[in-house]
Amino acid sequence: MPRYIRAHIPGGTFFFTVALLERKRRLLIEHIDALRKAFASVQAQRPFTIDAAVILPDHLHCIWTLPEGDADFSARWHAIKSRFSRSLPNQERLSTRRSAKGERGIWQRRFWEHAIRDDEDLARHMDYIHYNPVKHGHARSVADWPYSTFHRLVKRGVYAPDWGAGDNVRAMELA
């Protein structure tokens, strides 16, 4: 198996996709408070800024900025996944391999990350994040989805309250 090399950019800004192992489950929104608590706990121990985020039933997307001199997002994701998993009852199916390693069968082992290159790249990824609930059919409009940073960013003037409605959305595919 090829060894994946992660980006190492101290103080960098990154887009992430993290998914449940069983993509038909709805654990992330059914246990949203536990997920928020896991994020807050890790953020208190190993600070990072959440620039944008959306939580869907079976996966999440977010953009983080790490502190100056710090490039270790992997340890943060490991801790978030671990804390969230420990908060849930043991009800998932486990493979022999995961069981032997003492793992839970909740998360996919890996995650996708992309180093944000510039302001345009950041804007494109923020739009992608916030439009994702509509794309996946979980909401009719961006403003209808409660599990994202969209509402916070509307208050800050980054987005108009009706952003994502009708024709005011540019192409949402990421290159």
Give, region by region, the residue ranges found by the protein language model.
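Short catalytic/metal-binding and nucleic-acid-binding patches
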Residues: 1-175
